[in-house]
Amino acid sequence: MSLEFLISKIQKNNFLLIGRAGVDIYPDPPGTKTENTNRYVTHLGGSSANMGVQLTKYGGSCSLLTRVSNDALGKFALNQLDYYGVKRDLVKLEDNESRISFAIVESTVEDHQSIIYRHKAADLFLNKSDIENSNLQDYECILITGTSLAAEPSRSSVLFALELAKEKNIPVIMDID
């Protein structure tokens, strides 16, 4: 696959992002340490969701393929995807005891902390049928993240998506995350 081919596919602005949507909270006001605040601001998180937001902001058409927890935080992420225009028809609610990824992120310059909770992360329950039902051929480019390879069944499902992408000559971009 040549660089020119990759660039031509990227320029078509039609992306499938495979990874996670999460929830990020920030101590408020900005610059406040977590242990010194009593107020937080909540935002959409997760590298794949965030890439989708930015690509959409600049004219891209993005679909996110992931799973989120079937609770208030998972539904918050879905609402945020809608707000930013990231297509979520491939996002499934996970009804087991999994949870959405959750991060507390400080905006301090010194002694910065990011605290990330990913116990039984919903996005890692992505499975082969999710990939089979995603119609990979409808996308010009696929973006994956390193964390989607961290545990089963997501790992083998994403590797299956890579095999299909190769067969269909769809370029894949990986964010180490």
Go through each PLM region and give its residues.
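Glycine-rich phosphate/adenosyl-contacting loop at the front of the ribokinase-like
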Residues: 2-87
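Short amphipathic alpha-helices and their capping/turn segments at secondary-structure boundaries
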Residues: 2-14, 128-134, 157-167
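Short, basic, glycine/proline-bearing loop/turn elements
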Residues: 37-38, 116-118, 145-147, 175-177
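General beta-strand structural signal in soluble alpha/beta enzymes
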Residues: 17-18, 90, 173-175
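Conserved N-terminal subdomain of the carbohydrate kinase-like
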Residues: 61-144
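Short secondary-structure boundary/capping elements
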Residues: 43-50, 123-128, 153
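Glycine-rich nucleotide phosphate-binding loop and flanking beta-alpha elements
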Residues: 24, 123, 149-150
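Conserved beta-alpha-beta core of the PfkB/ribokinase-like small-molecule kinase fold
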Residues: 141, 147-177
